[in-house]
């Protein structure tokens, strides 16, 4: 499942780059409840594939912590 793969990658990037859920949904202007449901509880019913891709692209381009 594509969303499952994106979910795993986003979590890896969040850990590596110290990127919080708050930063994701605030900067991308997404619904906090849906983003948290997807990232914390892997509830993919709350996340469209387009939003998942948008989050992944943002996380990938987010600068790394030094």
Describe the function of each predicted region.
Residues 1-18, 26:
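A short, Lys/Arg-rich alpha-helix, primarily the initiator
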Residues 3, 21, 45-49:
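Alpha-helix N-cap/helix-initiation sites
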Residues 10, 24-25, 35-38:
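Conserved hydrophobic/aromatic packing and binding residues within compact polymer-binding modules
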Residues 11, 22, 53:
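Residues within the helices of the helix-turn-helix
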Residues 14, 39-40, 51, 59:
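DNA major-groove recognition helix of helix-turn-helix
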Residues 29-47:
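Recognition helix of helix-turn-helix/homeodomain-like DNA-binding domains
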Residues 48-65:
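DNA major-groove recognition helix of helix-turn-helix/homeodomain DNA-binding modules
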């Amino acid at each position: 499942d594509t969303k499952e793969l994106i979910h795993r990658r986003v979590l890896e990037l969040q850990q590596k780059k110290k990127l919080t859920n708050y930063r994701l949904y605030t900067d991308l202007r997404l619904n906090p409840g849906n983003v948290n449901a997807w990232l914390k509880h892997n509830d993919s019913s709350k996340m469209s594939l387009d939003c998942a891709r948008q989050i992944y692209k943002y996380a990938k381009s987010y600068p790394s912590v030094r």
